[in-house]
Amino acid sequence: MIAALLPSWAVTEHAFTDAPDDPVSLLFPEEAAHVARAVPKRLHEFATVRVCARAALGRLGLPPGPLLPGRRGAPSWPDGVVGSMTHCQGFRGAAVARAADAASLGIDAEPNGPLPDGVLAMVSLPSEREWLAGLAARRPDVHWDRLLFSAKESVFKAWYPLTGLELDFDEAELAVDPDAGTFTARLLVPGPVVGGRRLDGFEGRWAAGEGLVVTAIAVAAPAGTAEESAEGAGKEATADDRTAVP
């Protein structure tokens, strides 16, 4: 599903179930040490999403290696590579690309079900809640509140590698096209500079199926460069600022 949302230069791998193997056996020692005290659910999702990521990196011709969480939990990718991971109940996925092609990637998958009570007010702007109400009546097959949440997660995942800074839910205003399968995010804070141009937002794509809503953003690398340079403004991130949604 996610592959269809990204350019051809992005490589994706996904899994709908965890491997039957002992999850620790799928990890490099450094990774296993990072989740030594994790509960089984966390251990399985951590291992499986890295199996997906290593498979995607292999398709780029890169050898397997540890993918350790860095500051804010963002994975540390090999030099010359950008990527993004996502996991939710019943899905794990990864997308990678060479830095010559992509400045940043952001992917997210969520169950196609309503957000828990009270969460929408925490993650949305009044303008977003207005169009959500209209879409809920028009297309009840998609839980648009969950799609909004997923899209904002993809926005953050695309934003963070470019800035190293936090982006609150109310600092990007989203609009979704239900027919084209696209969305736009207008940044309400100064955006990162990529290739000498300051971004004022992100464009992404979405899909629903297999009991999921999935979203993806690809920021292309500046033409003729092998890596992006970025700067931005905002608040520093911490590892657990973001709202976790079941």
From Swiss-Prot:
Short name of any one Pfam family annotated for the protein: ACPS
Keyword Transferase: yes
Known EC number: 2.7.8.7
Catalytic reaction list: apo-[ACP] + CoA = holo-[ACP] + adenosine 3',5'-bisphosphate + H(+)
Protein origin, superkingdom: Bacteria
Signal peptide positions on this chain: none
Residues annotated as transmembrane: none
InterPro entries: 4-PPantetheinyl_Trfase_dom, 4-PPantetheinyl_Trfase_dom_sf, 4PPT_N, Enbac_synth_compD-like
One GO molecular-function entry: holo-[acyl-carrier-protein] synthase activity
The UniProt record lists the keyword GTP-binding: no
GO CC annotations on file: enterobactin synthetase complex; plasma membrane
Chain intervals with Low complexity compositional bias: 223-232
Positions of region (Disordered): 223-246
Sorted UniProt keywords: Transferase
A single BP term in Gene Ontology: enterobactin biosynthetic process
Feature: compositional bias, Basic and acidic residues: 233-246
Functional description taken from the UniProt entry: Transfers the 4'-phosphopantetheine moiety from coenzyme A to a Ser of an acyl-carrier-protein. The enzyme is able to transfer the cofactor to a broad range of enzymes with acyl- or peptidyl-carrier protein domains.
Family that this chain belongs to: Belongs to the P-Pant transferase superfamily. Gsp/Sfp/HetI/AcpT family.
Protein name stated in the entry: 4'-phosphopantetheinyl transferase Svp
Gene that encodes it: svp
